[in-house]
Design a protein with these regions (language model features):
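Residue-level detector of alpha-helix boundaries and kinks
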Residues: 1, 13, 42-45, 96
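Short, low-complexity N-terminal intrinsically disordered segments enriched in polar/charged residues
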Residues: 1-34, 133-136
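A beta-strand edge to alpha-helix "cap/lid" segment located at domain peripheries
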Residues: 2-5, 61-137
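Short charge-dense sequence patches
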Residues: 5-18, 38-42, 57-63, 81-84, ...
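Short, mixed-charge, low-aromatic patches
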Residues: 12-22, 47-50, 65-68, 90
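Hydrophobic pocket/interface hotspot
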Residues: 13-16, 28-29, 36, 53, ...
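A solvent-exposed, acidic/Ser-Thr-rich amphipathic alpha-helical stretch
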Residues: 30-80
């Protein structure tokens, strides 16, 4: 299923996932500003909490991506809708961990965007699966 953007906010989010899936963390910087917030809605696992500004990349994404083979995980967008500055995405991610385990997880994302940047994003996933896969349970 191919998802196409209905507006510029949706296109920004699709572009974000394309770059995120590439593993090019430096290229992700163009999507954020100093007050951007990425909040995984999880508890008691690595990455929990709010990540702000370029710490999103330096202190959150870089360590998380380091748990996977280079270029993984990949995000596959299944559905997307938006209202005003909000974009909601249903997706799944696939990849391989550094120790060869297969990663497959379902996600829902809520983005708030303005002026061509991500102001805030909330990430929902099966955190129990993630904790178990990485031995955090």
């Amino acid at each position: 299923m191919s998802v196409t953007a209905a507006n510029t906010n949706e296109q920004l989010v699709l572009d974000f996932f394309e770059v995120l899936s590439s593993g090019d963390l430096e290229a992700l910087r163009e999507f954020y500003h100093e007050h951007s917030v990425w909040e995984p809605k999880v508890k008691n696992i690595a990455g929990a909490g709010k990540h702000v500004g370029m710490d999103i990349i330096d202190k959150f994404l870089a360590p998380v991506r380091g748990m996977f083979e280079p270029g993984d995980p990949k995000v596959h967008v299944q559905n997307m809708f938006s209202a005003g500055p909000f974009v909601c995405v249903e997706s799944f991610s696939t990849g391989k961990t550094m120790d060869g385990k297969i990663y497959e997880n379902d996600y829902c994302w809520v983005f708030e965007v303005s002026n061509g940047k991500i102001d805030a994003m909330r990430e929902y996933m099966d955190s129990h699966y993630t904790a178990k896969l990485f031995g955090m349970d």
